[in-house]
Each structure stands twice: as structure tokens, then as C-alpha cells.
Amino acid sequence: MNDLIINHIAELILPRSTDKPLKGKELDELNVVKNGTVVIKDGKIVYAGTHTDDYDATETIDASGKVVSPALVDAHTHLTFGGSREHEMSLKRQGKSYLEILEMGGGILSTVNATRETSEDDLFKKAEHDLLTMIKHGVLAVESKSGYGLDRENELKQLKVSNRLAEKYDLDMKHTFLGPHAVPKEASSNEAFLEEMIALLPEVKHYADFADIFCETGVFTIEQSQHYMQKAKEAGFKVKIHADEIDPLGGLELAIDEQAISADHLVASSDKGKEKLRNSDTVAVLLPATTLYLGKEDYADARGMLDNNGAIALATDYNPGSSVTNNIQLVMAIAALKLKLSPNEVWNAVTVNAAKAIDINAGTINTGDKANLVIWDAPNHEYIPYHFGINHAEKVIKDGKVIVDNTLSFKV
């Protein structure tokens, strides 16, 4: 006897399972089954496809008029941080630049101070609250970066918190050491601080899967970033890079040359960098909510990357300064509106390709897969990025069990 059958599904979304990320035109290929059925036993998928009455189960969910998809993957977050920066919004409205806000004691260094002052347990409670919000919105796989400690004690504190969260909730969660995220005030120079972070790599390897660096004007150069990435690979890390967010420094080209698993942001990436994606499996993780929040007009050139047969994914970039959202459904809508992605491209970018960007087996519904699913209160898969700003996730299913039920009920 099976444990659960989800039947009469209006649309069952079945992203293609591949060893490598979907590239170029492949991203627009999505198997959408009308009147579908999913059968689950022992937390695994037994069957997923067109409607069938050939299976029995102890529990049945009628998904008439609903969409069922794999649980979503958020491939770029800064989940563990102290404090918040809502007061900076008024400064931005007054026309203050990021550097001016930084000089006033705001910006990333204010988050560094707040994170340093927050105990590990309090940091855990805050991150747990934010993680549960992600789960309620359909996410069951997450990447979590450090980068707000900028010293040994506090970088480790951030990584320990994300590891505790993964253990408590048994999530597909990957942890990224982003020690070179900014340069703290106490550092004698960028170069000296970078060497401090490189020296930490063997120790943080016990808590982190990836090593990341912020390659940008005024932070770390291309040469410094390459040095760090090479040292990280020597220490056993797969590497990522925050690249070309503001200036076209060649961060995307560096990521491809160093065989990074992903290059993230890429708003200012050059045509040369986009062309190099053609022969690379590095995933371009695009973060359109960041561009929106910062009030910028130019978004990452998703269409140019796809035209060059590149692989792209989407993520929230959840952080307190430039993308204060942990709702990936909002990102899906922004990507459709501003990156000009089709509904199929959006869905693949938050499932199978996002999973490739953090090196996990997720984002598909195949026989033998973990039964990590979302039942959406939507008539079709195009409706979710179309009707933006609300939570369409009705039920979130983890390992075959309903762990979130957002069904509305009122007492009048």
C-alpha cells in the first residue's frame, strides 16, 4: 500500500532530469501534464504522470484545479545575519548613495556589527524564522552564505547556524563561506584581509560546501578573486563568485575559467563573458529582486545569456541591504516581467537549474526522487508568476508528508 496519492492535478510540472544544467533553448522545455497523478511511498516518488487509477494509498489529496510542482530551490541567500536596515530606505529616497550611507555608519558594515553582536542562539532564532517563511512559500532546498562576520569567530558562527538549521529541519541545504564579502574597518588592507580569509579555508571546510568572493570595484579585484578561488579549490571547495554586479570587471569570464559552479548577479557582464557561457556548465544565477530593490533600471541580460546557450537560474539574494525578500515567488514574477523569461524558463530556473547551481539532487519529480512537492492554488503554471505579490503555495510536502498547509479558513 502506498502512503499518498495526489490525483486530478490540473497541471503537473515535470522538469527534465539531466546531469548538467539546462542551457539555452532547453530552458524553455518543460513537461506539463494535464490531469496528472503523483504516487508516493516511504517518502519517495513511485509514479508521476498522466491520471491513473492503478494505485491505492492510505491517503488521497484531490488536486482538482491545482498545480503540482517540485519544491523550489533558492540558490543564493544570505540567511544568517543580525539586525535590519529599514532606516536606510528613507536615506535612499533622499538621494544618498551607497557610499554616503556607508560613511554614515550604514550599509554592509552596519550588518557586520549587528551580526557580531548577536549570539549564535539569537542568530539561529532569527534565521529560523526567515527559513520557515521560505518553506511556507514552497522552498525546500536552500543555499546559505556567511559574509557578515568578516572574522574567524563570526564567520564560523554564521556557518554553524546554517548547519544547525539544516540538521533541525533535515533540509537539502548547502553552506557557503563568503568571508571576502567586504573589508572590515579594522583590516590594514584588502590584500591582508583576503589572506586572513584564505587562512581560514581549511577550518571552515568542516562547515561549508562552497567558497565565494565579492569581486567588484572597491572590494576585491579580478586578480585577488582568482587567487582566492584557486586557494579555495586547493582546500577542497567548489567555488562561486559574486561578479559584475556594478561594473564589467570580467567576473563572469573568471568564473568560467576557474570552472565555478555558479557566477551570481552578472548585471554588468560583458558580451565576451556571455559568449563564454556557450562552452561552460557554470550556472549564471540571476537576482532580479536585488536590481528592483536598489532602484536600478538595467537588469541582467538573461536573454543574451540564453541566446549564447548559457545556463541560468534564479534566486532571491535574501539579505538586509539590497534584497529584503525571502519570497522566491516574487522573484519568479520579476524575472518574467524584467528579464523577459517565459513561464517555462522561470520554472526551470527555480527548480532543476537552481539545484545544479548548488550541486544538489532536487527540482525534479521522477521515480525514486524525494517526494518534495508543492501544491499550488493556481489554475495553471503560468498563473503563478503572473499574479504576483501573494503566496500561491497551498501545501508543501516534504518526504511525502504535508508539512505546510496554507489553506485559508475563516471564523465569521
UniProtKB/Swiss-Prot annotation:
Top EC class of this enzyme: hydrolase
Organism: Staphylococcus aureus (strain MRSA252)
Name of the protein in its database record: Imidazolonepropionase
Positions of Zn(2+) binding: 76, 78, 242, 317
Binding site for N-formimidoyl-L-glutamate: 148, 319, 321
Listed SUPFAM superfamilies: Composite domain of metallo-dependent hydrolases (SSF51338), Metallo-dependent hydrolases (SSF51556)
Compartment annotation: Cytoplasm
Keywords for this protein: Cytoplasm, Histidine metabolism, Hydrolase, Iron, Metal-binding, Zinc
CDD domains: Imidazolone-5PH
Lineage: Bacteria, Bacillati, Bacillota, Bacilli, Bacillales
Family: Belongs to the metallo-dependent hydrolases superfamily. HutI family.
Entry EC no(s): 3.5.2.7
Gene (name only): hutI
Pathway stated in the Swiss-Prot or TrEMBL entry: Amino-acid degradation; L-histidine degradation into L-glutamate; N-formimidoyl-L-glutamate from L-histidine: step 3/3
Cofactors, names only: Zn(2+); Fe(3+)
Cellular component per GO, a single term: cytoplasm
Its biological purpose: Catalyzes the hydrolytic cleavage of the carbon-nitrogen bond in imidazolone-5-propanoate to yield N-formimidoyl-L-glutamate. It is the third step in the universal histidine degradation pathway.
Pfam families: Amidohydro_1
